[in-house]
Structures are given as structure tokens and as C-alpha cells.
């Protein structure tokens, strides 16, 4: 469970129907019916990496920090030991709400599509890729994404003349998820091959992923041969709540606080694909002629994960966010 502070502009737009998504204690000025999809699309980006750390202007166009026209000193100068980047998107499919007869109590229903992704990339990874080093020790590479449907019912009401409370209950249907974690990756360039010693794992739910087979009959996954043959339908179910409060200090000054996405999704084992990487591997294709390395690029897609039979599903907490205003 990770707490993330958010400051989207809609939070401070009084009367916005989307505002109540950020704090269930907020009520719009009137009832509403959202236009499907167009009724509300929100995208948030968080982390300690900025766009300017990844993309650089070169000759009138944007290139990544790995481009040869961007020096290593410039590309790596703004990076940290741990570089984190996360994004989440909410697309409102159906939304409507109304005041009760007292015009103080408000209720609403929303059906949203939620997509979340995050990654943790250590400095040593960027250093290895940018400088083309012949060996490296890289720890703690993580990447994840998940998508789910959210059916939410909200209710807000005045507790006193100054305090307004709101709560939202949400039933969640997991569409799919993927997690990759490489805890340790020792890489060394030998005479004509890359040798690695690695410890990592990956999981995927909701999609049927084809595995490869070795001559000895064992099965493995490789991202270069990544083949998702079909979508198997809902892969998990869960529940979450949002809680919010507002306090009118004076007529033109209001304080607010909300905690969103307190909940979980339980992903079943039926559509769970799992791989484990705990041994040394060697990739050929590197040529050394007269002491000079040719075709030295390391291909992360060549990493092999041994297929592991899932014995049980997995329950994961949502990424909790806190909004203050």
C-alpha cells in the first residue's frame, strides 16, 4: 500500500463534477449525467523523474537520453540512485448523480476504467545502457501495470453547518496485471558472449502467455518471444473505499482532506502466469575482432524466466492517494 499525494487542478475547481472523484465530500452545484468517456478523463504522473530527464531537444526534435547526440554527462547528471516514475489514468464510462430533496445530501454512481503503471530504475541501469559498459551490477529493477473496472457509489452529507462528510464504496473487477522484478543482475561481457547471473521474477494475470520449451522439456518465458495468445476475462475482484471531509472555516475559506483507494484486488490463480529467474545465463552473438568489440548491445529481452506453476492467487493492496486542500 503506497500513499501518493496528488494535486490535480480539478480538485480546486468548485462545481466540477469530476471534483468529487478526488474527494467524496465534494458535491457539484447540481445533478449531472456524464457523456460516456468524454464525461471525465484524468491522467496523473508522479515520481522523481521529470520529462526533461528523459527527453532532450536535439536539432528541433525530441530524443531520449540514450541518443548518441546526448552526452553521458548530461544524460546521467540529473538521475538519482533510484529513479521512480508512475502514472495512472481514470476514464469515466458512465456517471450520474443528484441531490436529495433537501439539496444538501448528494449521491452519485460512476463506472470507471482505471489503468496504473509504475517503474523503479536504478542509476546503474542507465549508466550501463548509456555508457555501454562491459560489466555491471544492477539491483532492484521493478515495473508493474494493472487495469481494472471500478463501479462506485458515493454519498455525501452535512454533519454540521461547517463540516461535510463523504464516502464512496467501490467494487473492482480486475482486467489484467503484470509485474516484473529483477532483484539482482550481474552482467559481464566475455570473449564472444554476455554472461549474467540474475535473480528475478515476473507475474501476469488475465492474459494467456505462451511459453517456450527447451530440449530437456522445461518451459520458460522470454520477452523477445512474448506472445499473448488471448484474453481470458476478469482475473480478479476487490473492494475499496474513498473517505473525505470538508470544513468551512469562514465563508470564503474551506479546508478539505481525502484518502482514496483504501482497498485491494484478489487476483485468482486460474489465469496467473508466473516465471522465476535464479540461475546464470549466457547470450552469444558478440564478436571480438582484433581486440575490438562488435555488436556488443545487451538485449534484456533475451532473459529467460523458468515457468512456475501458480499454487495460489495473489491479493494486492491498491496504491492509496491523499488529497489536501
Predicted regions and their residues:
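C-terminal segment of classical bacterial N-terminal signal peptides
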Residues: 1-4
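Subset of outer-membrane beta-barrel
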Residues: 6-325
Amino acid at each position: 500500500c503506497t500513499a501518493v499525494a496528488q494535486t490535480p487542478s480539478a480538485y480546486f475547481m468548485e462545481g466540477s463534477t469530476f471534483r468529487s472523484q478526488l474527494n467524496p465530500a465534494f458535491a457539484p452545484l447540481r445533478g449531472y449525467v456524464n457523456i460516456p468517456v468524454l464525461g471525465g478523463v484524468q491522467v496523473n504522473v508522479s515520481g522523481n523523474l521529470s520529462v526533461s530527464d528523459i527527453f532532450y531537444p536535439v536539432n528541433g526534435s525530441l530524443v531520449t537520453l540514450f541518443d548518441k547526440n546526448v552526452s553521458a554527462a548530461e544524460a546521467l547528471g540529473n538521475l538519482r540512485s533510484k529513479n521512480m516514475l508512475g502514472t495512472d489514468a481514470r476514464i469515466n464510462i458512465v456517471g450520474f448523480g443528484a441531490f436529495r430533496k433537501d439539496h444538501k445530501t448528494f449521491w452519485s454512481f460512476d463506472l470507471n476504467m482505471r489503468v496504473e503503471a509504475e517503474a523503479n530504475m536504478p542509476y546503474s541501469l542507465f549508466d550501463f545502457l548509456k555508457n555501454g559498459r562491459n560489466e555491471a551490477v544492477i539491483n532492484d529493477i521493478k515495473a508493474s501495470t494493472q487495469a481494472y473496472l471500478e463501479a462506485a457509489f458515493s454519498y455525501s452529507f452535512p454533519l454540521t453547518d461547517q463540516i461535510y462528510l463523504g464516502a464512496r464504496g467501490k467494487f473492482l473487477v480486475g482486467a489484467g496485471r503484470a509485474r516484473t522484478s529483477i532483484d539482482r543482475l550481474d552482467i559481464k561481457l566475455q570473449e564472444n558472449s554476455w554472461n549474467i547471473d540474475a535473480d528475478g521474477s515476473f507475474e501476469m494475470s488475465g492474459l494467456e502467455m505462451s511459453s517456450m520449451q527447451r530440449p530437456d522439456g522445461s518451459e520458460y518465458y522470454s520477452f523477445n518471444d512474448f506472445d499473448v495468445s488471448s484474453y481470458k476475462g476478469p482475473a480478479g475482484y476487490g473492494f475499496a473505499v474513498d473517505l473525505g471531509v470538508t470544513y468551512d472555516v469562514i465563508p470564503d475559506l474551506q479546508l478539505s482532506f481525502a484518502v482514496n483507494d483504501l482497498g485491494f484486488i484478489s487476483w485468482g490463480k486460474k489465469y496467473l502466469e508466473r516465471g522465476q529467474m535464479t540461475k546464470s545465463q549466457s547470450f552469444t552473438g558478440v564478436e571480438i575482432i582484433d581486440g575490438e568489440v562488435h555488436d556488443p548491445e545487451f538485449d534484456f529481452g533475451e532473459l529467460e524466466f523458468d515457468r512456475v506453476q501458480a499454487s495460489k492467487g495473489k491479493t494486492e493492496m491498491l496504491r492509496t492517494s491523499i488529497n489536501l486542500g
